[in-house]
Regions:
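PRPP-associated nucleotide enzymes
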Residues: 1-192
Length: 192
């Protein structure tokens, strides 16, 4: 959940980054998250995976595919836009990119798993919870992140994490996914 952290600005030069995860490590992390989701949710038919654009949507697609392969269940997915639910909308220099939210309704009596690429301050996750509440009141909300880099500003914790990666606040984590970025799957650490 890197939006708090210059996610949508120009990328630093690739030469200054350190690769943290390659495509195979990302695949293994997502497979592990898949098994944890299956173990923690007895009724997978009541689960909705809700990806935060952009990379959270692609990660959601991959998780749903893995769940289908492992549990033989077609899990419902959706997209949850957080742009207008963020607590920093009025203080940002640029307007946030707005994407359409699309969730399978109703959400009542269901478990919604918010999916994002990076969990940082927790503000994007909080905004996602606010956005979900505008669609209904799920029985439970869980959080999945490919990378948890720490530095929470809110009392939010991921239920499912691919990789815990302690960082300095001035460092930046970038997740690159082939279907989104037209670059090989990788997680990069950039020092400023």
């Amino acid at each position: 959940m890197q939006m708090d952290d210059k996610k949508h600005t120009a990328s630093p030069a690739r030469t200054s980054g350190v690769p943290i995860m390659d495509a195979e490590a990302i695949r293994r992390a997502l497979r592990r998250i898949t098994h944890e989701i299956i173990e923690q949710n007895a009724d997978l038919k009541s689960v909705v995976l809700a990806g935060i654009p952009l990379r959270g949507v692609e990660i959601t697609r991959r998780l749903a595919e893995f769940i289908r392969d492992v549990a033989k269940i077609e899990i419902e997915t959706g997209t949850i836009d957080v742009a207008m639910h963020r607590d920093d909308v009025g203080t940002r220099a640029e307007l946030p990119m707005v994407h359409a939210s699309k969730l399978p309704l109703p959400l009542e009596h269901r478990t919604v798993i918010i999916v994002d690429d990076v969990l940082f301050t927790g503000r994007t996750a909080r905004a996602a919870m606010d956005a979900i509440s505008s669609f209904g009141r799920p029985a439970r909300i869980q959080l999945a992140a490919l990378v948890d880099r720490g530095h929470r500003e809110l009392p939010i914790r991921a239920d499912y994490v691919g990789k815990n990666l302690p960082t300095a606040t001035r460092e930046q984590i970038q997740v690159r996914l082939q279907n989104v970025d037209q670059e090989p799957d990788a997680v990069w650490l950039f020092k400023e």
